[in-house]
C-alpha cells in the first residue's frame, strides 16, 4: 500500500536539526543524567534507541541537502527549532527557503519572565516562527507540565495565538518521567482554553489517557514525533480514523529517524483513505496557521 497523493505536500512537524543550539538535547541530557552510559553517547541523549542518528547529522546541518531530501519524499515544509539566543541559523533557512521551513521557540520556565520576553521577541523576528516548544524532562531542574512556572509562558502563547509543542510520556533519555505525565495536561487545558497544546513523543505508556484527553479538550492535539510509523500506537491511529481526524498530525523526527524508514513504513499504516490529507497536511496548516506561509508553494 502507498500513501495517497497529498494536496499541498506533507507537513513535517518535527525536524530536530541544529540551528543554533546543541543538536538533539545532548547538552541538557548530560547535565541531568547520572548513569555512565549517557556520557558515552555521541549524538543523541537516547542513543540506545536512535543508534544510527549520527550517520545523518552532516545532512541535518545542510539546508540545501535537506530540501532535496524533502523533495524526494513529498515533504512541503518542516518545523525546526529556533534558539532565542542564537536565531541566526534558523533565520537564514527561513530567508533562503521561505516556504519550506517553519520555526518553534524552545522555552525554559525556570528563567521566569526572561523566557517570556525571549519567546515574544523571537516570534516577532520572522513570520515563519509559529510556535513554542518545551521538553519538561530536559529542563534543569525539571518542571512539570502543570507547574505554575509554565503559566506565564502559556499565557503569552495565548496572547500571541501560537501553539506549544509539549513532550509527554516516558522520555528516551535516562531522566525521570513524572514531569511529563500526560495527565498533567488536564488542568492546563482546563485553565487555558485558548491555548493550543500539541502532544509530542507519543505519551507512552499512557496513550489511552492521551486519547481520552484529546477527546475531552478541544485545544489538545497529538503529533507522532520520535516514533517510526510501524510503532505508532494503534489506539492513536484508531482515534485518528474516527473522532480524532482533526486532532492527529505527522511529525517525523529526522535525523533521529530517517525519511527512508518513515516513508517506507508509512503506507502500511491502517489509516483510512480520507484521513491521510488531514493527518499529513491540513491539520498542521490549521493548528499552526500556515496558510500564508505556504500559499506561494
Model-based region annotation:
Residues 88-95, 115-122, 143-147, 174-191, ...:
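Distinct, well-ordered alpha-helical segments
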Residues 57-69, 111-123, 207:
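Short, acidic/polar
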Residues 1-13, 20-72, 77, 244-247, ...:
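Mid-to-C-terminal alpha-helical segments outside catalytic/metal-binding sites
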Residues 18-20, 85-88, 110-113, 139-140, ...:
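Active-site environment of divalent metal-dependent phosphoester hydrolases
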Residues 76-77, 82-172, 176-179:
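Active-site gating/metal-coordination segments in enzymes
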Residues 196, 203-262, 268-274:
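Active-site-adjacent C-terminal substructures of enzyme catalytic domains
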Residues 11-15, 78-80, 102-105, 130-134, ...:
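Hydrophobic faces of well-ordered beta-strands that scaffold small-molecule active sites
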Amino acid at each position: 500500500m502507498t500513501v495517497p497523493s497529498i494536496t499541498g505536500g506533507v507537513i513535517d512537524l518535527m525536524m530536530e536539526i541544529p540551528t543554533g543550539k546543541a543538536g538533539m538535547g545532548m547538552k541538557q541530557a548530560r547535565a541531568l543524567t547520572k548513569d555512565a552510559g549517557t556520557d558515552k553517547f555521541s549524538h543523541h541523549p537516547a542513543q540506545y534507541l536512535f543508534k544510527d542518528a549520527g550517520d545523518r547529522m552532516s545532512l541535518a546541518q545542510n539546508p540545501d541537502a535537506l530540501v532535496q531530501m524533502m523533495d524526494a519524499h513529498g515533504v512541503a515544509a518542516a518545523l525546526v527549532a529556533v534558539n532565542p539566543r542564537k536565531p541566526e541559523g534558523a533565520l537564514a533557512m527561513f530567508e533562503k527557503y521561505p516556504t519550506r521551513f517553519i520555526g518553534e521557540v524552545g522555552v525554559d520556565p525556570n528563567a521566569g519572565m526572561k523566557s517570556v520576553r525571549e519567546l515574544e521577541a523571537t516570534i516577532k523576528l520572522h513570520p515563519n516562527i509559529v510556535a513554542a516548544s518545551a521538553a519538561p524532562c530536559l529542563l534543569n531542574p525539571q518542571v512539570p507540565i502543570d507547574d505554575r512556572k509554565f503559566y506565564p509562558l502559556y499565557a503569552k502563547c495565548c496572547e500571541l495565538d501560537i501553539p506549544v509543542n509539549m513532550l509527554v510520556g516516558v522520555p528516551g533519555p535516562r531522566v525521570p518521567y513524572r514531569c511529563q505525565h500526560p495527565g498533567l495536561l488536564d488542568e492546563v487545558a482546563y485553565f487555558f482554553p485558548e491555548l493550543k497544546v500539541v502532544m509530542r513523543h507519543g505519551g507512552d505508556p499512557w496513550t489511552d489517557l492521551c486519547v481520552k484527553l484529546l477527546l475531552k479538550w478541544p485545544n489538545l492535539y497529538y503529533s507522532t514525533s520520535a516514533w517510526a510509523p510501524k510503532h505508532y500506537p494503534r489506539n492513536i491511529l484508531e482515534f485518528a480514523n474516527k473522532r480524532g481526524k482533526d486532532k492527529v498530525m505527522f511529525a517525523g523526527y529526522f535525523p533521529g529517524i530517517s525519511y527512508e524508514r518513515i516513508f517506507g513504513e508509512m503506507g502500511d499504516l491502517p489509516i483510512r483513505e480520507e484521513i491521510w490529507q488531514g493527518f499529513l497536511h491540513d491539520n498542521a496548516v490549521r493548528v499552526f496557521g500556515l496558510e500564508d506561509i505556504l500559499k506561494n508553494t
